Amino acid sequence: MISAVTLSVLGLIAILGYLGIFTALHVLPTGRHPVRHAVSDYAVGPYGRIFRRGLVISSVGLLLTTLALFQEPGSPPLKSTPLVLLLLVPVARVGMAVFPTDLEEEKITRTGLLHHLFAVAAFALTYTAISQLTPDLADISPWSSFSGLLHALHRIILVSLVLLVVTMTPRLRRIFGLFERLFLVSTNVWFIAVGAGMVAAAA
């Protein structure tokens, strides 16, 4: 069996790699605006392959980190329900990759609607799992030493998710991308903190 530390290190590398790709998509001439456009819009066009690779790398990182947490990093052991929810996130992301989104100026299609449904599922699963895991991890060493960070990230994730939903309305749609990006960055930083804690536990 691969150790939790090894899984965590590989997971950290993958998540950091994803954030690198995420940053690159905002630097490359994609024609997408970081405030107005959804992140999934990067999948449509010449940079779609880069976006999909980032989606795969991010999912692998999440899976590795989750598998590490399954190895009961502390006492009491973590509940299995939020970990199972995290395992379902990559499944939802597969749906997002298979069914590309519709761009703002295009008519909504069945494919685009399915993409949005899978995206909603991925976001909801991610938030629910983080919401349930944060208080438990905060009571387990070594995460207890930076429990304030985990709780702060959890609050940022909640606020960004709420604002993300609010800005889905037509009047506020022009700033939807900003809060979607805040949600994605804050959740990935949360996973990085968790993975770093796993590595620190074995140090």
Language-model features: where?
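Hydrophobic, aromatic-enriched alpha-helical segments typical of multi-pass transmembrane helices
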Residues: 2-31, 36, 43-202
